[in-house]
């Protein structure tokens, strides 16, 4: 078994640990948000964690009275003055596998000096370089991926941002949805692995992932996984926006994965008909 495969198969167990960890830290999270009542968030990441930062920002910005922005740490350190007003007065959330990425550490040091913002890190390595700079550290050392491409780590970081948002917003429904996904993850893997094997055996050599809303970042990370693991071209686009230009490169050997949102059928169905007409295999993922 390949290392990446083993890490993916371990995801249900690691998600269970992550959910337990957040339950154990519930009082710490409550205290942090009581002491820091800003309604503004800046989420920093690099690479995969920046993609997750975009999903996190989308989610937090949807909460009542809350604004949120995702910034690539490398973008920030190139021109911190440009981001001055964006970051000022915010809670800074840092997503990182190692917690040692130089751009992340430099960016947080600058933000602390320039703004004194409270900071929360979510990482998978204990004793990392971000921890001494943060006001709250959430360390998920059971889901650290040794593979170059993050899989299990990404899933757990994403779940962590959902649980953090649930605590911030006191949203029990969001928290329960994460717990439900965790409980069903093993059966989900077993049910769909044969289907995934069939899809893998189809004739395709490039991938497009389509998604909107709070899953946009993790969808983009999914496209990156095809590039890093399969060494094929993987691209991400917003669902309906795909029609406005990028669809012209879709062909008979383009595998399209579309994450459809519940509650709207007409527009999404019309978009999928356009994609199907391009001739390549199409897979839809939706919540029934």
Indicate residue ranges for each PLM-predicted region.
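Flexible, glycine/charged-enriched surface loops at secondary-structure junctions
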Residues: 5, 173-179, 197-199, 236-237
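Acidic catalytic cores of enzymes that act on phosphate-bearing nucleotides/polynucleotides
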Residues: 203-267, 278-280
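Acidic/glycine-enriched edge-of-secondary-structure segments
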Residues: 9-19, 61-70, 176-185, 223-234
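Glycine-rich phosphate-binding loops that contact phosphosugars or nucleotide phosphates
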Residues: 25, 34-183, 212, 247, ...
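An N-terminal, well-structured beta->alpha segment
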Residues: 1-39, 183-190
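Accessory alpha-helical/coil subdomains and C-terminal extensions
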Residues: 182-202, 208, 225, 230
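Short gly/ser/thr-rich secondary-structure transition/capping motifs
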Residues: 23-27, 71-77, 189-192, 237-241
